[in-house]
Amino acid sequence: MGTMKVGVIAAEMEGRATGVGRYLEGLLEGLELWEHGIEWHLFFQGDPPLSLDFQGGPIHAHYSRHHGSRVLWEQVLITRELEAVEPDVVFGPAYTLPFGLRAPSVVTIHDISFEVLPEEFGLRERWRRRILARRAARVAQRVLAVSEHMAGLLRAQFGLAPGRVAVVPHGIDTKQFSP
């Protein structure tokens, strides 16, 4: 068996990192410590993030430089870019997966605030999140939850079988926080 290729939708790391961007940075930094033989292909919508060094090693950055709609890029345009790399699996760390993917996929759904606190979201954003997260949960081979509680909510809200949801708790950034 050759090297496994993982395509990662990494746009949340661009610019000022969001919570999901910081989650992905921490995950990749933690995985760098392992000798795992995985080739990581990170896909960015626009410009490179400043936070990680992508020179050589098992991490390869791909920049689409599409400065239009994030939803259009992450749902449609990225599919062709991902398939050019022929990944063994695609990882969506931010609730969604692109339409038309042929590769197996994994998605992290951090919360379902758009379902349980709908009044906190505008109508358009609430429906965008509902539709895309539900679809991603339906098509992914595995859905990652950040706690047992969230895994239970995902199974109940989206009708997921227990075996399709895995719990991967958030870690801690020991550079910023220490006992």
Q: How would you describe each model-predicted region?
A:
Residues M1-P179:
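Carbohydrate transferase catalytic cores enriched for Leloir-type hexosyltransferases
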